[in-house]
Amino acid sequence: IPYGGNGVHHGKAGDSXTVDTAIGNIGNNAASIIGGMISGWASGLAG
């Protein structure tokens, strides 16, 4: 799931707190961090 223009991450919901947040921090964009958490959670549910 793309978010924040900083890339795509497909993973388990448990990844969102680490991987997605790290990607968001690279973008230095609060919206990317929040979007990353949501996308990690959503992709975890989607499998």
UniProtKB/Swiss-Prot annotation:
Predominant subcellular localization, coarse grouping: secreted
User: How is this protein's function tied to pH?
Assistant: Stable between pH 4.0 and pH 8.0.
Characterize activity with respect to temperature.
Thermostable. Retains 100% activity after incubation at 60 degrees Celsius for 60 minutes and 15% after incubation at 121 degrees Celsius for 15 minutes.
Where located?
A: Secreted
Task: Give the superkingdom in one word.
Answer: Bacteria
Q: What biological-process terms (Gene Ontology) are attached?
A: defense response to bacterium; killing of cells of another organism
Q: Which residues form a coiled coil?
A: none
The alphabetical list of record keywords is:
Antibiotic, Antimicrobial, Bacteriocin, Secreted
GO CC annotations, alphabetized: extracellular region
Q: Which family does it belong to?
A: Belongs to the bacteriocin class IIA/YGNGV family.
Q: Give a short account of what the protein does.
A: Has bactericidal activity against various Gram-negative Campylobacter, and the Gram-positive L.monocytogenes and B.subtilis. In vitro, inhibits C.jejuni strain ATCC 33560 (MIC=27.3 ug/ml).
Q: What else is known?
A: Antimicrobial activity is lost upon treatment with proteinase K, pronase, pepsin, trypsin, chymotrypsin and papain, but not when treated with catalase, lysozyme or lipase.
| Name of the protein in question | Bacteriocin curvaticin DN317
* UniProt lineage: Bacteria, Bacillati, Bacillota, Bacilli, Lactobacillales
